[in-house]
């Protein structure tokens, strides 16, 4: 056998012999999108397994209904943790393993801080550490990184095949794409993402009607317009998110959004440099979808946020590690190093803020010269 094989879970059947323990290690990536049944034959082929995933992102799509699933569990006396429709491989592993066997990857390297900070607080309990290299962000001329909301007072229509779309948002998105790539000749990657299939299809159709825009987007901007599922694992320099919801939004659309916060998390965190939200901000602020209402509040606060830390807090006077914000994110090694440096006469400032980053230990000389110890 080759020392390393890379296959999808469904293609393994025709590519890998069905024999026990033929691999020393099986690595399952995007495990929140893997159903349990499809992975069992792969587990049979391996001695050990590493399961990697994020249960705050997209789950697998079940081919059976919840009612069918429950009936099968009851018929064969199988515990709910093995539910095909409700639980992924990640969920199962997370439930049966001890906390000591779990490793959390907390450093975030993709997005500008304002973009990821909402998801960090809303979905990840503030545990992520932002480590994005801002020097690699691709920005349009004279534009800053971050979140921009284009307020559109539209009207929602319901197609015969279900879902929802908003022509007012579609027209505004075409205008914004023209501004970015035709007027400003932006060369970075661009994506347009929406929760609703009909909205994505109509945006794509609208782009088809503007040949110059279509040619630029698909040849120079690695462009993608689709629903959230097509963006899992992907990223773009600029993401335009079309919320769709506004006046006359069908009740079913609101229920769908309420139950799919993980889709919203994936959608907005695909953006590296700029997240542009196109939608009715007033409607979204009271739409009865909690995470959407929180996001509106967050974006409104961004414009009013002032960062002016008190420099007096940056000179600890004792060898005891100080009480800093988000103390749960500080490792025991950081605390130990702080103490040993203090004993050696080297005074450091823990969790020193620089823009949206927090330096583990900073050495500050005369309020000017700074050294970061990570």
Predicted segments with their positions:
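A short beta-strand element within the Helicase C-terminal
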Residues: 21-27, 226, 234-246, 266, ...
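Signature of the SF2 helicase/ATPase Hel1-core->accessory helical subdomain module
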Residues: 34-86
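Active-site metal-binding core of divalent-cation-utilizing nuclease and nuclease-like domains
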Residues: 342-372
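Conserved helicase/translocase motor-coupling segment
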Residues: 125-205
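SF2 helicase catalytic motif II
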Residues: 21-35, 50
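Interdomain helical connector at the RecA1-RecA2 junction of SF1/SF2 helicase-like NTPases
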Residues: 80, 86-156, 162
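Helicase C-terminal subdomain and adjacent C-terminal extension
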Residues: 65-103, 120, 212, 250-352
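Conserved helicase NTPase catalytic core signature
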Residues: 1-22
């Amino acid at each position: 056998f080759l020392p390393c094989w890379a296959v999808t879970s469904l293609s393994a059947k025709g590519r890998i012999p069905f024999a026990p323990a033929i691999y020393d290690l099986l690595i399952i990536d995007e495990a929140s999108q893997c159903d349990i049944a499809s992975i069992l034959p792969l587990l049979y082929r391996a001695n050990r397994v590493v399961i990697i995933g994020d249960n705050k992102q997209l789950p697998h799509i079940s081919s059976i209904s919840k009612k069918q699933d429950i009936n099968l569990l009851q018929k064969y006396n199988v515990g709910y943790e093995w539910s095909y429709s409700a639980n992924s491989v990640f969920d199962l592993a997370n439930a049966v393993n001890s906390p000591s066997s779990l490793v959390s990857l907390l450093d975030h390297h993709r997005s500008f801080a304002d973009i990821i900070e909402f998801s960090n607080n809303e979905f990840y309990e503030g545990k992520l550490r932002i480590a994005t290299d801002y020097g690699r962000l691709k920005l349009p001329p004279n534009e800053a990184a971050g979140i921009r909301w284009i307020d559109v007072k539209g009207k929602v229509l319901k197609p015969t095949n279900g879902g929802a779309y908003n022509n007012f948002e579609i027209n505004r998105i075409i205008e914004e794409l023209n501004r970015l790539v035709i007027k400003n000749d932006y060369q970075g990657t661009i994506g347009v993402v929406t929760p609703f299939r009909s909205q994505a299809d109509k945006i794509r159709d609208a782009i088809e009607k503007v040949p110059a825009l279509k040619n630029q987007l698909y040849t120079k901007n690695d462009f993608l317009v689709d629903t959230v599922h097509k963006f899992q694992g992907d990223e773009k320099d600029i993401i335009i998110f079309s919320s769709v919801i506004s006046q006359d939004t069908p009740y079913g659309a609101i229920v769908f959004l309420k139950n799919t916060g993980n889709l919203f998390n994936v959608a907005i965190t695909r953006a590296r440099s700029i997240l542009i939200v196109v939608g009715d901000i007033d409607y979204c602020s009271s739409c009865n979808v909690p995470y959407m209402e929180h996001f509106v509040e967050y974006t409104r606060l961004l414009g009013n946020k002032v960062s002016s830390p008190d420099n007096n807090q940056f000179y600890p006077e004792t060898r005891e590690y100080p009480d800093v914000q988000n103390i749960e994110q500080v490792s025991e090694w950081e605390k130990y190093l702080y103490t040993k440096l203090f004993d050696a006469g080297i005074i450091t400032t823990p969790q020193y803020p620089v823009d949206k980053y927090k330096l583990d230990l900073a050495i500050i000389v005369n309020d000017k010269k700074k050294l970061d110890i990570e």
